[in-house]
From Swiss-Prot:
GO process annotations (BP): valyl-tRNA aminoacylation
Lineage: Bacteria, Bacillati, Bacillota, Bacilli, Bacillales
GO cellular component: cytosol
The organism of origin for this protein: Bacillus cereus (strain ATCC 14579 / DSM 31 / CCUG 7414 / JCM 2152 / NBRC 15305 / NCIMB 9373 / NCTC 2599 / NRRL B-3711)
Motif interval(s): 'HIGH' region: 49-59
PANTHER family: VALINE--TRNA LIGASE, CHLOROPLASTIC_MITOCHONDRIAL 2, VALYL-TRNA SYNTHETASES
Protein name: Valine--tRNA ligase
Domains as described in the record: ValRS has two distinct active sites: one for aminoacylation and one for editing. The misactivated threonine is translocated from the active site to the editing site.
Length: 881
């Protein structure tokens, strides 16, 4: 694609810039890991998106951060593997496929399991193709030769092996437990699939009569229909109000069942009446209480949310219909004494919207405590631990690991990894294995599939060839270097990958975890369908381009923080790219057919040349350091300031002097510096804005095929000149001050005015005299005087800069009162700066701990502010003469 035409198109058009480039990168195989043993490997596995539809802004943000990391490392000489893949997303995908079938008047049961799975695979193929297209639009440098899917054979083999090994170790078991149950889809749900909503409900206050006829005990519930499964009433053992009742029984209203009054510390004495009904089959806390007291578990609902035969006369009713009828009956019986309105949080299925039912069910579980112990212990080993960025999320992770519950891993679905367990048709014997029993005709396989998170937990190593530990990719690229993900799935995914990685590979699955927040709208609200505030990243790309979206997403927040998405800010980024484009056009038009090998930085340089090269060095150092710390926002801001302010607004303007002059040697040096600085800047910017940087770089004199594999910039000490940088800062301060004064008195730059500069000493005088051509070019004086012993002219506008005072005698334009007010404001500013720096230097803690260079820097600031303050005071005194 090499294109060293000197002219870019006149206008920046993101559509034409981005068109075709991604395909060109893929054809060049620039994103494929090479396996080159001379290079250090660097690995990231993409958090696999669900094959359920379009990618959202959160995906765009998450993958952009990964792309920035991998593009940077590739340019730094690493053998980079960024492995793509997708998740089968059990319930989410099955719900989508079932929804599509319903539109055709078909249920999954009409099709049967095999035919339904064919439909699910068709869905997967269609939406996987959409996702790849979206990845391409964002510009993600993925190694598609290694793409994986959680239901691929290799990954399925890994899942079965892990299940069997955990089962053989006694870490997977089958038992009864309270799970989140979705009556609409008839499956267990993980906590992340439950959305909690504030709902207007009620406390139903009831009197349960003591069986001996001596009175009653009052309690309240928000789910009266579950009372049909009550097997006890509980009070706190130290509650003096009820101590005398412990061991007695009450008669369950309507049902007539005699149930005990028990004592348990689970009960809060000060909440409500201090009495709670215990329904072990319909509440997780009650289940635990029931286990402690050996209470029976009475399940009163069917899987579809209807009441079963244990509910007596309410058998067959929907649970909410039962609630209405039961409340009427309780009122008629005189048991229900009050209905108190109550707003409370109720779990709803993320997929079906149905109210989730805590439900007793026989499921498969992972025994978590032994696995979590190893993961917690790992964090005590400084060299082996997983590093969380920001660090505070390590505590979040550890808190959860230290208070972990067993994990329900079975789901009543068809789409997913079918549990590798079989039941003997005659004996009921359970067989668990990676292969089916030899006499398969005598066995029935478990109908359930595994929780999607079970296979996702193996993602960092199953994608690299495990359980074949001799796999070339597994040996070279595991463990991975970084995981980029949101804080909302630390528990559900990050923690599980860590303990499974430790259990089956003996290593952490990744060295670093970079945590980001959620994408919110400009008002800070979570994006959702109900609010109608969601934004499709493809729409953003169409309007402003992937580069603009990527730069905003990657620089718009700090690690761990939420991101407020703003189209206005994306537009501002587009304007920034447009400025880069125009600056690049200027550079290219002045290259005079220069070849890469003709770039020569050894010629005599102006102060502006030395300054821009020094600033480039500083920017390279800042960007590289911040990238290493995952501070993409800071890195991006360093680049933005350098490109917009230093390169475009100052250096390019100053470069016009030699470019349009007669000195051929100066022209050549300036062209070389323009080409070099733009080349290095495009490389630094490339991970953020891959498309436009490739386009510009291809037009620049360059070597190599693509910027994607060009070397990352490094600081060049031979181009560092801090003295020249200080000289340039003085020039910039003078030019800015003159422009500000002219603006205050409405004197356009085109109008020539007399200008006088009083240099602090001979050294400053020499600097300013040497660089006077810049002052004349950018300040447009009719006459320029630079001396060390100047007297301030009467009625002159004044500015104070480090090392000099400026005077613009604008007698006819000055309002003395306004000038006095302006100087008093300046004096106030310098008073505050002097106070601030002196306070810092008088702080013994600061002086004792700060590096000597920092303290010296503060003392230099103090001296500078004192001199500026004195100059302003003198000027105010002159005005009073």
């Amino acid at each position: 694609m090499s294109n060293t035409e000197k002219n870019l198109p006149t206008k920046y058009d993101h559509m034409s810039v981005e068109e075709g480039l991604y395909q060109w990168w893929l054809e060049g195989k620039y994103f494929e890991a090479t396996g080159d043993e001379k290079k250090q490997p660097y690995t990231i596995v993409i958090p696999p998106p669900n094959v359920t539809g379009k990618l959202h802004l959160g995906h765009a943000w998450d993958t952009t951060l990964q792309d920035i990391l991998t593009r940077t490392k590739r340019m730094q000489g690493y053998d980079v593997l960024w492995l793509p893949g997708m998740d089968h997303a059990g319930i989410a995908t099955q719900a989508k496929v079932e929804g599509k079938l319903r539109e055709e008047g078909i249920s999954r049961y009409d099709l049967g399991r095999e035919k339904f799975l064919e439909k699910a695979w068709e869905w997967k193929e269609e939406y996987a193709s959409h996702i790849r297209q979206q990845w391409g639009k964002v510009g993600l440098g993925l190694d598609y030769s290694r793409e994986r899917f959680t239901l691929d054979k290799g990954l399925s083999d890994a899942v079965n092996k892990v299940f069997v090994q955990l089962y053989e170790k006694g870490l997977i078991y089958r038992g009864e437990y309270i799970i989140n149950w979705d009556p609409a889809t008839r499956t267990a749900l993980s906590d992340i699939e439950v959305i909690h909503k504030e709902v207007q409900g009620a406390f139903y206050h009831m009197n349960y009569p003591l069986t001996d006829g001596s009175g009653h005990i009052r309690l309240a519930t928000t789910r009266p229909e579950t009372m049909l499964g009550d097997t006890a009433v509980a009070v706190h053992p130290e509650d003096d109000r009820y101590k005398h009742l412990i061991g007695k029984t009450v008669t369950l209203p309507i049902v007539g069942r005699e149930i005990p009054i028990i004592a348990d510390e689970y009960v809060e004495k000060d909440f409500g009446t201090g009495v709670v009904k215990i329904t072990p089959a319909h509440d997780p806390n009650d289940f635990e209480v029931g286990n402690r007291h050996d209470l029976p578990r009475i399940l009163v609902m069917n899987e579809d949310g209807s009441m079963n035969e244990k509910a007596g006369k309410y058998n067959g009713m929907d649970r909410f219909e039962c609630r209405k009828e039961l409340v009427k009956d309780l009122q008629e019986a005189g048991v229900l004494v009050e209905i108190e309105p109550h707003m409370h949080s109720v779990g709803h299925s993320e997929r079906s919207g149905a109210v989730v039912e805590p439900y007793l069910s026989t499921q498969w579980f992972v025994k978590m405590a032994p696995l979590a112990e190893k993961a917690v212990a790992l964090q005590q080993k400084e060299e082996e631990k997983v590093t969380f960025v920001p660090e505070r999320f390590e505590n979040t992770y550890l808190r959860w690991m230290e208070n972990i519950h067993d994990w329900c891993i079975s789901r009543q679905l068809w789409w997913g990894h079918r549990i590798p367990a079989w039941y003997h048709k005659e004996t009921g014997e359970v067989y668990v294995g990676t292969e089916a029993p030899a006499d398969i005709e005598n066995w029935n396989q478990d109908n359930d599939v595994l929780d999607t998170w079970f296979s996702s937990a193996l993602w960092p190593f199953s994608t690299l060839g495990w359980p074949n530990e001799d796999s070339a990719d597994f040996k070279r690229y595991y463990s991975t270097d970084a995981l980029v993900t949101g804080y909302d799935i630390i528990f559900f995914w990050v923690s599980r990958m860590i303990f499974q990685g430790l259990e089956f590979t003996g290593e952490r699955p990744f060295k670093d975890v970079l945590i980001h927040g959620l994408v919110r709208d400009e008002q800070g609200r979570k994006m959702s369908k109900s609010l109608g505030n969601g934004i499709d990243p493809m729409d953003v790309i169409e309007k402003y381009g992937a580069d603009a979206m990527r730069f905003f997403l990657s620089t718009g927040s700090a690690p761990g923080q939420d991101l407020r998405f703003s189209m206005e800010k994306v537009e501002s980024t587009w304007n920034f790219i447009n400025k880069i484009w125009n600056a690049s056009r200027f550079v290219l038009m002045n290259m005079d057919d220069m070849k890469y090998e003709e770039i020569d930085l050894t010629g005599e340089k102006s102060v502006a040349d030395k300054w821009i090269l020094t600033r480039l060095n500083e920017t390279i150092e800042s960007v590289t350091r911040n990238m290493d710390k995952y501070e993409f926002g800071e890195a991006g801001r360093s680049l933005y300031n350098f490109i917009w302010d230093d390169f475009c607004d100052w250096y390019i303007e100053m470069a016009k002097l030699p470019l349009y002059g007669e000195d051929e040697a100066a022209k050549k040096t300036t062209r070389s510096i323009l080409a070099y600085v733009l080349d290095q800047t495009m490389r630094l910017l490339h991970p953020f804005m891959p498309f436009v940087t490739e386009k510009i770089w291809q037009h620049l004199p360059h070597e190599g095929e693509s910027i994607t594999v060009a070397a990352w910039p490094t600081v060049r000490e031979d181009l560092q000149d801090t003295e020249a940088a200080a000289e340039m800062h003085l020039l910039v301060d003078i030019i800015r001050s003159v422009r500000n004064i002219r603006a205050e008195v409405n004197t356009p730059m085109s109008k020539k005015v007399q200008m006088q500069i009083k240099a602090k000493d001979e050294a400053v005088l020499a600097q300013l005299t040497k660089n006077s051509s810049y002052i004349e070019r950018f300040c447009n004086p009719s006459e320029l005087t630079i001396q060390t012993d100047l007297q301030a002219p009467e009625k002159a506008m004044t500015a104070i800069v480090s090392g000099a005072e400026l005077f613009l005698p604008l007698a006819d334009l000055i309002n003395l009162d306004e000038e006095r007010a302006r100087l008093e404001k300046e004096l106030e500013k310098f008073d505050k700066e002097v106070e601030r720096v002196q306070k810092k230097l008088s702080n013994q803690g600061f002086v004792a701990k700060a590096p000597a260079a920092v303290i010296e820097g503060e003392r230099a600031k103090e001296q500078d502010y004192l001199e500026k303050r004195e100059a302003v005071r003198q000027r105010l005194a002159d005005l009073e003469k």
